[in-house]
Amino acid sequence: MGKPFIVGLHCWMRTHRVLGFSLVLVCWAVFALLAARMQPDSSSLAFFPDDAPQLHRMAKALDVSPASGLLFIDLYTERHGGKYALASAADAMVGDLPSDMAERVGAVGMPDARALMALLPYFTDEATLAHLQRATADAQIDTSVRATRDNLNSLLAAGPAQEWLRADPLGLRQHVLSRLPVEHAGAMPDPVLGYPVSADGKHLLLVLRPAHSLHDVSAAARLMDAVHASMQKHLAPDMQGLVVGGHRHSAVNAQVIQRDVTNIVFFSMLGFVLVYALLVRSRGVLWLMLVPAFAASFALGGMTLLSPVLSGLALGFGASVLGVAEDYAVHMHFALRSGQSTENVLEHITPPLFQGYLVNASGFAVLLLSGIPAVRQLAMFALLTLSAGFALAVIVLPVCPWFNTPPLPVHKQNTEPRQPAPLRVFACVSGLLLLCYALFSIVRVDVSPRTMGAGMAQLQKDGEKLKAVWGSRDSNILVVECKTTTEALANGRAVADALRRLEPDNKLGTLTDVWPSQEQAQANVQRWQAFTRAEGPRVRALLASAAQRYGFTAEVFAPFTQLLESPVADFDPAALRAAGLGEMVDVFLHAPTADDPTARLLLFTSAQTDVSQLEPALAAQTTALAPGELETTLLQQLNMEKRLVPLAWLACLALLFLYFRDVRRTLLASLPPLCSVACILAWMSLTGHPLTLAGMAAMPLVLGLAADHGIVVTHDLVSGVKMGVERAVVVSSLTTFTGMGLLALAQHPALKAMGEVIFWGLIVEVPVALWLLPKLCRVEGKQA
């Protein structure tokens, strides 16, 4: 950027100040209105790579997985007979929850006896028909009725058992129940209470189906607030509640972040006030404080022109770049207070500031090549923020009132130009590079999404407690995805048949066992009808005779005899819900919705399955969800993004060399960011802290400030002209520390990691820029 252009633009702004400010305010208003269109996306899907559709399918499938898509609440009491009180509390909690937040998952077991037996005709395959013929033999009917009498005279006849014995005197229900994948669908509920109760009667399980995705962080937080409020209201002092589920993970993150930000904002604002009051001492601080707000408005407004939906997590990480945008304004402020004319200041300070802007922008520009949408959004936000901050600093702020007052105290300054001492600089850079290489081989890099979560240890502990009482639901799940539920069921049957043939030892639970195809149902019904036409009258007569012989009325087995007489309609899925299997259907089959047009059918397997062994057409529509599979696949994709780091470094070094056109000066200016990296890696190696995604997100701020300071200080040393650079470096570093470095005190792992990286990066960067760089230079003409 040429000096005459900036000086000429400044002269125009100074001459047409009213018009210039009006244009700036109009532009700001337009971009602020555009920013109001922004729709923050709290979903984590933006961090899944574009070229990994399998990851997106896994993430969406997690929403329908029982282990993550449901919310499990374990209610516990030591009270004798306390299960009844727990059931009353659970009913009250369900009544308190708004229907648009969650609904209770009802009883999966204890289906209706008559309606369940009505499914038998649809399941009468060859094996069932053979058993049916054996069970209806004359002698076997007599034996079965006698056993029924014995059961009715025992304690087994209490409650629903009577209905089962009347509806199925011949013990045929096993051919229906054996098809139910109840071991995968959920815990069996108590027939009286309607909730699953542990064997000791001390635990009761309430299962909720949230109305929103677990990726919707704000909705998950509202749901958990409502659940905890309801538990506090309805649980007696001797009762305890334990909540486990993916929505709790999301809510804990949101709540911890909100608490951290609330606690740290006060100290950050206090730090800003102290820094400005002690080191700036100017009414121009008002303009400095407005720079981040202006830059953020321009950046957000510009991004909404590309897409109104922006990742909240990406913008949260990108907000750290606001500190670099303010850095330009701080340097301009102290340079203007040096006592020289504005034109001289602009000619002197604009080139290094512009070079610092280009160096930072080049690093973020490389990130635009990322395959992760959130990283590209972060890069674009950073580019727009840096551009707005630089433009404000060199064009608008120099003509703002009070911005250049009061003059700085005049100190004796060495204005003799200096040049880097080659041996000293090369020795320092070589040593730092070797140190960074050695430390990086020691530091553990952990880009796991788990490092972004709060309270993971407690959440895992609570999950183990739930498993100890109710067993594990960490099944291996296959998700068959199609456009319609009909296609999903058809492909699910094909997948189930193939797996039973390829992996006979892999236990499979699938809805297709109780939801036969139209052809299967018709063939089975034909067998049933042929049997009832031929044997029905005989069976009814033998049952009536045996009933009277053993002391029953002739109509005691009317539910079963009516089944033999009644015509059988075509199979209708409503028959499953009539039998009390609706919740099981909802667990396994998920119809398309307005938000997600994909139908999904779940198949549960006892062992991990390799879907690649299926036919290509089936394998393409089937996703395997083994425990930890999503995280493993995501880590593989994120590791591929590491290639962008050396590219960003090379881009920054190339621009530095193009600016200084001298290897010695380029290496000298690169010392502050190198020292920052070395200090961060040294701290991590000594403490055992890994380099996480959040730490990587904070790196651009530290390296951006360090690069800016290295360029500006090197420029001043080489030119011999100083315009308040030392104070500008200290102020910009301290404001960044108070604004972002205090995040090291946060409880959320991601925020804490960001704060620690910024803290240790800035600790060493300031003394290196202000003390070490001058020591590595010598006055021209003198020997090192």
Language-model features, listed with the residues they occupy:
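Solvent-exposed, non-transmembrane loop/terminal regulatory segments of multi-pass membrane proteins
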Residues: 34-79, 183-193, 422-424, 441-483, ...
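Extracytoplasmic
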Residues: 160-277, 282, 562-657
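Hydrophobic transmembrane alpha-helices and their membrane-interface caps
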Residues: 285-331, 665-713, 741, 771
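Pore- and gate-forming transmembrane helices of large, multi-pass membrane proteins
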Residues: 289, 340-370, 718-747, 766
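Signature of alpha-helical transmembrane segments and their immediate interfacial
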Residues: 2-42, 394-448, 461
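Juxtamembrane segments of multi-pass membrane proteins
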Residues: 424-545
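Transmembrane alpha-helices and their membrane-interface boundaries in multi-pass membrane transporters
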Residues: 305-306, 321-337, 350, 354-412, ...
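Alpha-helical transmembrane helix bundles of large polytopic membrane transport and channel proteins
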Residues: 85-204, 505-585
